Amino acid sequence: MNPSPITIDLILEILSRLPAKSVRRFHCVSKRWASIFGSPYFKELFLTRSSTKPRLLFAIAEKGNKEKDCVWRFFSSPQLENPYEKSSSTLVATAEFHVRFSPDNLLICHYYDLKYFSIGYAFGLIYIYGNRGRARPLICNPTTGRYAILPNRYTYRKAFSFFGFDPIDKQYKALSMVYPSGPGHSRVITFGAGDLKWRRIKCSLRHDIKSEGVCINGVLYYLGDTSDWSRVNGNHVTSGYMIVCFDVRSEKFTFIDVKRFCRLINYKGKLAVIYWEDDVDIQELYYKKGIDVEEYVENNVNADATNELCVWILADVEKQEWSKHAYTWTDEKFFRRLVSIAGVTASGEIVFSMRKCNPKQPFYVFYFNPERNSLQRVEIQGFGEAVTKSCDVCTFVNHVEDLNVYDLKQLKSVHPPLVEPEYYDSD
């Protein structure tokens, strides 16, 4: 009896479980295979499979040979689901190296800006923007290293930029906000379709920017402060911290008032804020008071093993009503001043990651389960020779591979000839 032939559906089912790099190799087999693997059906199937195995993405930044250079290395490791059921001691996960990212003759980020959130992530792509000198804003695929240089902008003093994704039109957009008292205009750029051009955009409230951005269901959120601009903000009553909400699709701004400095996260598809008892506004310390942030955190942020955390989840956007929760836990290796909030897993664990990686010390991520009020630490191994000295680490949760990202034509080769990007005036 002859064996039954393998159906194309079974082949696609098997291949949808492979890494994206492996799938891309099959494009070269024949035009028919390239057509099959480039079809919307297979891309959706692959994304569905990939979404069931999210990973932690690590962007490790190291000071380059020149004073301003910053060299990036991208790794990923399995994102553990319900790690508490496996062990009460330290677990171990191995990081997979993807790419060293330092395009020739291209300054992409001033090294000393790293502590002031100079990197963003959205649906498989990394956005790195420069804040000083002639640093270039760009978007890259952290798995392959393919990237696109965005048109540069003249900015007065320090500007801030954010990265978001519109799930309806499936478009990536970068938002650049100017310094509130300086010349120029805030702008937005759409990536993935048409020419790369910054378009002028207007925000009705002047505000200082106080946090990195988080994009949830097509809305980009970040923390702002109107304290210094109450006289020019018209009828808006607020004179303190607020959450700025930018709709990526409509490109309109709305605002949510909050009482104090906080950290923003995506909690199971809802906006949530985290309050630490001893949290500090690093922008206020550095830019207004001239205080060294690292030194302040070292000397003033609680170094005790007992941690207190408040989580507010936005239950009603229109009424601005919050569901409020408070937690306390103890762990001898978890120190507030050494970690940053990486995000929240699909099952609701809040993930914390060490902010720096040192070759002489273990590198940990921590999974906090609010329902159990318990913390599980996981040692990440595998950075190896990439980390020969203390480096800054940005960690992102829920990283999945998407074949649509691989097909973006504006992502060039790893080291294309450098073309000077267009500059925009400050008008």
UniProtKB/Swiss-Prot annotation:
It holds the Pfam family FBA_3. InterPro entries: F-box-assoc_dom_typ3 (IPR013187), F-box-assoc_interact_dom (IPR017451), F-box-like_dom_sf (IPR036047), F-box_dom (IPR001810). It comes from the Eukaryota. Residues 1-45 form the F-box domain. SUPFAM superfamilies: F-box domain. This is F-box protein At2g16450. The lineage of its organism: Eukaryota, Viridiplantae, Streptophyta, Embryophyta, Tracheophyta.
